[in-house]
A protein has these predicted regions:
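Short hydrophobic/aromatic-rich beta-strand segments that constitute the beta-sheet cores
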Residues: 73, 145, 220-222
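Residue at a beta-strand N-cap/secondary-structure junction
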Residues: 32-33, 70
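PLD/PLD-like phosphodiesterase catalytic module centered on the HKD motif
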Residues: 2-31, 38, 43, 49, ...
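Short loop or secondary-structure boundary microenvironments that flank
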Residues: 29, 77, 147-148
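PLD-like (HKD) phosphodiesterase/transphosphatidyltransferase domain
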Residues: 97-171
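Basic, amphipathic "hinge/linker" alpha-helix immediately C-terminal to the N-terminal HTH DNA-binding motif
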Residues: 66-87
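Short beta->alpha linker loops
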Residues: 44, 68, 127, 149, ...
């Protein structure tokens, strides 16, 4: 096999993006227009080095010069730059994705992994449960979630928000194992009454690989391990609008596929 520069196909694009200086130039140009001398100065590069790399970007159609002689991203270049953050996120978290899957997510979700780029990674079951509790407690309009497991300790936290008028919508896996005492607790807090009032709505899917919980302010996502089960030891937590939209789109996608909630399918702990 030859290691020479590819002349056509997507390989030629990846080759142009392979240089750190060229990537930095594209990132800078996505923010504003530059003259080459300004760009070289901000990136601490020599004029010779900057000129050589910029010539490549211009020849590849990613960058052009405007009437004032300033460097600008072409429409094609701007589109390419918008896609780079998805690769950046996957690269920065490559150790995680070496032993975690994406749970069979449709391509339209995988192609938007850039939505995760500003997320915080939360480690440990206790830390994750605490974040869930805070998310529930701070909800003012709604809570939506897709769950494979039922945390008994948080049911009362959710119910207190529902009592305050927060709408709660959730999707359970039909093979979820529910903790002992859940049925009695739901009866105690009047869960059926919440459902009849339309404050709580629920549906069911055969299984859940990717979990999410989100409200109008925050969101979190848990991906599955190599067994296909959500890893409750690592969670992506974020506040960005794009990330919350990703969570909402995943929820809506699963909600449309989900069937009627059937309590009898749930496995109860002995």
């Amino acid at each position: 096999m030859s290691d020479q520069q590819p002349n056509e196909g997507v390989g030629s694009l990846f080759f142009e993006l392979a240089g750190n200086l060229r990537l930095s130039m594209l990132t800078k140009l996505s923010q504003r227009n530059y003259r080459l001398s300004q760009l070289a100065s901000e990136l601490d590069a020599s004029m010779q080095e900057a000129h050589r790399n910029m010539t490549r970007l211009i020849d590849s159609g990613l960058v052009a010069k405007d009437k004032e002689g300033e460097l600008v991203l072409t429409a094609y270049g701007r589109t390419v730059v918008m896609i780079i953050p998805s690769y950046d996120f996957l690269y920065r978290n490559r150790d995680f994705f070496l032993d975690h899957g994406l749970g069979g997510l449709p391509p339209k979700f995988i192609q938007r992994m850039a939505s995760f780029q500003n997320c915080e990674i939360v480690h440990g079951v206790m830390a994750i449960l605490q974040r869930w509790k805070s998310l529930y407690s701070e909800s003012e309009k709604f809570i939506k979630e897709i769950m494979a497991q039922v945390p008994l300790d948080l049911i009362e936290t959710v119910s207190s928000r529902v009592e305050s008028g927060v709408k709660f919508s959730y999707i359970f896996a039909s093979n979820a194992v529910v903790p002992k005492g859940r049925t009695q607790l739901l009866q105690k807090i009047g869960w059926r009454n919440f459902i009849s009032k339309g404050l709580v709505e629920r549906r069911m899917v055969p299984e859940v690989a990717v979990m999410t919980i989100f409200n109008e302010k925050h969101g979190c996502v848990l991906f599955p391990n190599m067994k296909g089960e959500p890893d409750l030891n690592t969670m992506f937590y974020g506040e960005d609008r794009e990330f919350r939209e990703w969570c909402a789109d995943l929820f809506n996608y699963q909600w449309e596929k989900a069937g009627q909630f059937d309590e009898s399918k749930l496995k109860h702990e002995v």
